[in-house]
Amino acid sequence: MKKKGLYQIKDSDKKVKEYTLSVLTEDKAGLLNSITIIFNRRKINIDSLNVSTTEVKGVSRFTIVVSSTKEKIIKVVNHINKLIDVLGAFLYEEDEIYYQEIALYKLSTKIFLKGDLIEKIIIRKYGAKILKIEKDHTIIQKTGTKVGTQKLYDELKKFGEILEFARSGRVALSKKKRKTINFLRTLEKTKSNKLNI
């Protein structure tokens, strides 16, 4: 039986672009490995990966960002949909989702003694905030897109060395009016076994 969410390949799908996959799964150990192996076999690098719980108990959401051709990524999505503990895999382009990432920047506290210019850049221009100030370092937090967090990184680099930098994986929700629980109930009706929802 075919699951919902299977995609067809068109001739126009050969250009490399950024795609976001949202994969709903049962909360089972070992599934991360099963999913990442599919990308490895097709030589597709995962740019960002986030796994979290959903609003439905026992269901996890994998948010995976890749740069690939649509042709290749459709094959990956179709393969992921065939995994036993996968409830549904969905493919999105950037304009089809709401998404955010978080970035943390560790800077020497000394650069803040040079005046308020850096604080104006951080707070006013980039909407970042100072998370923690210690004697030897200061932590800045920025939530936004990868482009936005990278622009702040480049700007901060001009003031001195960035001691440490970390960026989270993307979290994303579809712009479509689909509720996870409704999708799972529809899926449950087509399956012989009951889902624990």
Specify the residue positions occupied by each region the protein language model found:
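Amphipathic, charged alpha-helical scaffolds that flank and support histidine-based chemistry
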Residues: I64-S67
